[in-house]
């Protein structure tokens, strides 16, 4: 498999020269400076590619070309934004880039409540605490109708949690949820966030799914024409939040997506950390079922807590994810592709604990150098063992 590393562009404090030392050969990145809904110019793509290749690496995957909210809502300038998305795909293909990751999560990208949760060994991890999230939803955001999503016990626990926070901790919780985590392209004030949430008041899961289908039927033929493989990323966590619908959370959702626009260009990002939050999903079985359409793998593990809706990001080989089984399934698919002439299979260590020098270095939450280096080394070790033992 192709070992890749997410890099956030020239402003990333982790340099391409450092990434090359990790053993990764491919870069996963995007033109983050271009606003959502705008066309990525071919010249800008080519220049970023030249920068990456000058360090002896390859631009392997785009993560992500963001999908504009007008497309998700099926409103406003939806068709204009779809046309721009199509042109961006053409421009990427003209530069030889052939895998594009994207998501269809309304408003929020991936969501956490704590960006530096202490680990027993002294490092820190990302965490989602259901009670903290409920406190934000009920008493900081004050979302209309939120009370119906929580029972009395949950509301009382959320109030008690909030009462235990000083003003700086309350603001930190707000910023963590709405200010945008790495990879998110939109950043909101609390007031603007309320307005954007309200725009989805009449959009349920069925309507959001219809809008996704419309998008797929428009962009998948273009992707197939120019030789790009689209890889949709799952919801994180894989369930509705803040009254917003989510439609990329289960194997059933994935099957619907593949059926909505049947094409080898229509595939998925297999993110074990996102799907793995759900105890109902057998990740190994899912990987085997959809192996042929997995065009990008995010390998990460999570550990569910006493309240199974709460979780923290564990070490890559720990937690609730059968990572050995997942990698075995991916190696099997890689062998099939090598035999049948299929496409390459890039993977990246998705997130990592902040360890050692990471704790004093200004890096993006979840994207440290040493923590991901450790994760990549562990994943490569499992892959090598499976291949050498012909498991």
UniProtKB/Swiss-Prot annotation:
Query: Which ranges of the sequence are coiled-coil?
Result: none
- Which pathway or pathways does this protein act in? Carbohydrate metabolism; pentose and glucuronate interconversion
Where is the segment annotated Disordered? Answer: 334-359
Tell me which positions the record assigns to the signal sequence: none
Enzyme Commission number(s) of this protein: 4.2.1.8
What's the top EC group for this one?
A: lyase
Statement: the UniProt record of this protein carries the keyword Cell membrane: no
Reactions that this protein is recorded to catalyse? D-mannonate = 2-dehydro-3-deoxy-D-gluconate + H2O
Q: Which cofactor does it need?
A: Fe(2+); Mn(2+)
Q: Does the keyword Lyase apply?
A: yes
Alphabetically sorted, this entry's keywords are: Iron, Lyase, Manganese
**Disulphides:** none
| Family as reported in the entry's similarity comment | Belongs to the mannonate dehydratase family.
Family matches, as NCBIfam families? PRK03906.1 (NF003027), uxuA (TIGR00695)
Free-text function comment from the UniProt entry: Catalyzes the dehydration of D-mannonate.
What protein name is recorded for this chain?
A: Mannonate dehydratase
């Amino acid at each position: 498999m192709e070992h890749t590393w997410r890099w956030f562009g020239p402003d990333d404090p982790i340099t391409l020269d450092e990434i090359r030392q990790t053993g990764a050969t491919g870069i996963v990145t995007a033109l983050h400076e271009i606003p959502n809904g705008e066309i990525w110019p071919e010249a800008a793509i080519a220049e970023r590619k030249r920068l990456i290749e000058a360090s002896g690496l390859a631009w392997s995957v785009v993560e992500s070309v963001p999908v504009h909210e007008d497309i998700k809502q099926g409103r406003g300038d939806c068709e204009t934004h779809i046309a721009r998305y199509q042109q961006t795909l053409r421009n990427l293909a003209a530069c030889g880039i052939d895998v594009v990751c994207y998501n269809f999560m309304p408003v929020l990208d991936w969501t956490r409540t704590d960006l530096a949760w202490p680990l027993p060994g002294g490092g820190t991890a990302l965490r989602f605490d259901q009670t903290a999230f409920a406190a934000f939803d009920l008493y900081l955001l004050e979302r209309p109708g939120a009370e119906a999503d929580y029972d009395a016990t949950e509301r009382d626990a959320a109030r008690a949690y909030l009462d235990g926070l000083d003003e700086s901790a309350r603001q930190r919780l707000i910023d963590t949820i709405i200010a945008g985590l790495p990879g998110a392209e939109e950043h909101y004030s609390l007031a603007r966030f309320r307005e954007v949430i309200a725009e989805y008041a009449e959009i349920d899961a069925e309507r959001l799914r219809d809008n996704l289908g419309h998008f797929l039927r428009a962009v998948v033929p273009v992707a197939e024409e120019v030789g790009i493989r689209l890889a949709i990323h799952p919801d994180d966590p894989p369930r509705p939040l803040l009254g917003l619908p989510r439609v990329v959370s289960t194997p059933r959702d994935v099957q619907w997506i593949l059926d909505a626009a049947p094409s080898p260009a229509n595939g998925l990002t297999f993110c074990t950390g996102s799907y793995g939050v759900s105890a109902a999903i057998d990740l190994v079985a899912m990987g085997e079922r959809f192996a042929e359409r997995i065009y990008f793998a995010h390998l990460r593990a999570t550990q569910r807590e006493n309240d199974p809706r709460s979780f923290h990001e564990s070490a890559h080989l720990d937690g609730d994810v059968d990572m050995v089984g997942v990698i075995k399934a991916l190696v099997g698919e890689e062998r099939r592709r090598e035999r049948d002439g299929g496409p390459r299979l890039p993977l990246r260590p998705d997130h990592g604990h902040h360890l050692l020098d990471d704790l004093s270095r200004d890096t993006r939450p979840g994207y440290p150098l040493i923590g991901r280096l450790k994760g990549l080394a562990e994943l490569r070790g499992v892959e090598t063992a499976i291949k050498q033992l012909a498991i």
